[in-house]
């Protein structure tokens, strides 16, 4: 009998994507993050669905409904803690996934890369609107500060901000629409992730060496299903450790106070995964300039394929580029730290220097390093 998984219209797609998929034999653990992101998305959709059954998107009851979930709903505390910390795990995997793509030159699969950048932006938007929903102090003021950035757009800015708010400030209408956005966006992310995979399977996976792996491929199952399962166990271990032992470690204490438009918290800051972009935004003493820098800090990923000057795809055998890559990593960690600090010296100047270095590394130093490595590899006789 002909194998059903190879003939059935639906099973055939799954078979070509996850079972009989020819995969390079040398891809390392850095290639696990795609599947981990898929798992994170499923966890977030499921926990979010059950939270939405008990949540009310009204300014008067939103905060108390979240408290009710944690106190009165069966395992509601667990759902909330998994959902909140699941977002942190999602972004951790995202940053490592993007970093892997930059290090090994995966961005040369341009369609896959561009869809990936759109996915990153969509996930960031989802996390932002989701953070507003508990309607704590930091939820409210975070929403106020970030949506206010729209007003920096010349001519149409104020109209745009008020249109976004559904009034003259962040209020009931804003909360209701943010809940609607937060519910629909994960499904858009799922659709985009499928397109991301579709483009990836047009070319096949890249590999650490950066050379064409067609001569040496193995089936995805059982080799990489078992390898992904190990990554999954580690992900769940970290998520459960966070959610069960220290659920509020990555949150902000201000969010335990209900939103109060008359009382501004001393330090308005977003969740840790936005701090690098927030630091870049704050490092420019001009509203519009800051907004443009904020956008550029993410959208710069779209032009990385155009800035590839090296003759080799991967950084595996390029020590100068490797050094710059790790400087970039350290720089992003520095920006994340600065984003969580108050706006005072020496943090202001450190943030400005780190922001300048971020753009300098990506736009100038890394392309130059590629050219230099090409020159060094040329035979000199």
Swiss-Prot record:
Q: Is the keyword Lyase assigned to this protein?
A: no
Transmembrane ranges, per UniProt, are: 33-53, 77-98, 113-133, 178-198, 226-246, 288-308, 320-340, 347-367
Q: Which cofactor does it need?
A: heme b
A single Gene Ontology MF term assigned here is: ubiquinol-cytochrome-c reductase activity
Keyword Transmembrane found: yes
Give the record's keywords alphabetically.
Electron transport, Heme, Iron, Membrane, Metal-binding, Mitochondrion, Mitochondrion inner membrane, Respiratory chain, Transmembrane, Transmembrane helix, Transport, Ubiquinone
Cofactor descriptive note: Binds 2 heme b groups non-covalently.
**Pfam families assigned to the protein according to its UniProt record, in alphabetical order:** Cytochrom_B_C, Cytochrome_B
Q: Where does heme b b562 bind?
A: 83, 182
Q: Which GO terms describe its cellular component?
A: mitochondrial inner membrane; respiratory chain complex III
Where, by residue number, does a ubiquinone bind? Answer: 201
* Membrane topology annotation: Multi-pass membrane protein
Location in the cell reads: Mitochondrion inner membrane
Q: What highest taxon heads this organism's lineage?
A: Eukaryota
Residues noted as binding heme b b566 in the record, renumbered to the chain: 97, 196
Extract the PANTHER family matched here: CYTOCHROME B
Biological function: Component of the ubiquinol-cytochrome c reductase complex (complex III or cytochrome b-c1 complex) that is part of the mitochondrial respiratory chain. The b-c1 complex mediates electron transfer from ubiquinol to cytochrome c. Contributes to the generation of a proton gradient across the mitochondrial membrane that is then used for ATP synthesis.
Family indicated by similarity? Belongs to the cytochrome b family.
Subunit structure and binding partners: The cytochrome bc1 complex contains 11 subunits: 3 respiratory subunits (MT-CYB, CYC1 and UQCRFS1), 2 core proteins (UQCRC1 and UQCRC2) and 6 low-molecular weight proteins (UQCRH/QCR6, UQCRB/QCR7, UQCRQ/QCR8, UQCR10/QCR9, UQCR11/QCR10 and a cleavage product of UQCRFS1). This cytochrome bc1 complex then forms a dimer.
Indicate what this protein is called per its UniProt record: Cytochrome b
């Amino acid at each position: 009998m002909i194998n059903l998984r190879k003939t059935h219209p639906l099973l055939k797609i799954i078979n070509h994507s996850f079972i009989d998929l020819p995969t390079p034999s040398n891809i390392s653990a850095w290639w696990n993050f795609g599947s981990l992101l898929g798992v994170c998305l499923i966890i977030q959709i499921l926990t979010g669905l059950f939270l939405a059954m008990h949540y009310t998107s009204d300014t008067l009851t939103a905060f108390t409904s979240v408290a009710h979930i944690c106190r009165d709903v069966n395992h509601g505390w667990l759902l909330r803690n998994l959902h909140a910390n699941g977002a942190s795990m999602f972004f951790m995997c995202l940053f490592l996934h993007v970093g892997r793509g930059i290090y090994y030159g995966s961005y040369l699969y341009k369609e896959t890369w561009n869809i990936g950048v759109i996915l990153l932006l969509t996930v960031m938007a989802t996390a932002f609107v989701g953070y507003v929903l508990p309607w704590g102090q930091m939820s409210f003021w975070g929403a106020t500060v970030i949506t206010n950035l729209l007003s920096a757009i010349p001519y149409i800015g104020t109209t745009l901000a008020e249109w976004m708010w559904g009034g003259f400030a962040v209020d009931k209408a804003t909360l209701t629409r943010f809940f609607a956005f937060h519910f629909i966006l994960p499904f858009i992310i799922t659709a985009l992730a499928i397109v991301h995979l579709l483009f990836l399977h047009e070319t096949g996976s890249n590999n650490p060496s950066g050379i064409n792996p067609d001569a040496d491929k193995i089936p995805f199952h059982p080799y990489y299903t078992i390898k992904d399962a190990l990554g999954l166990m580690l992900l769940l271990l970290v998520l459960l450790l966070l959610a069960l032992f220290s659920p509020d470690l990555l949150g902000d204490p201000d969010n335990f106070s209900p939103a109060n438009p008359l009382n501004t918290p001393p330090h308005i800051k977003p969740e840790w995964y936005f701090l690098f972009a927030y630091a870049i935004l704050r490092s420019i003493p001009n509203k519009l300039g800051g907004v443009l820098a904020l956008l550029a800090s993410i959208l710069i990923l779209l032009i990385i394929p155009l800035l590839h000057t090296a003759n080799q795809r991967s950084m595996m055998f390029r020590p100068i580029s490797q050094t710059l890559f790790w400087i970039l990593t350290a720089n992003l960690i520095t920006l994340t730290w600065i984003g969580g600090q108050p706006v005072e010296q020496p943090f202001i100047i450190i943030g400005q220097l780190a922001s300048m270095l971020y753009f300098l590394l990506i736009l100038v130093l890394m392309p130059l390093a590629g050219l230099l490595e090409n020159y060094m590899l040329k035979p000199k006789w």
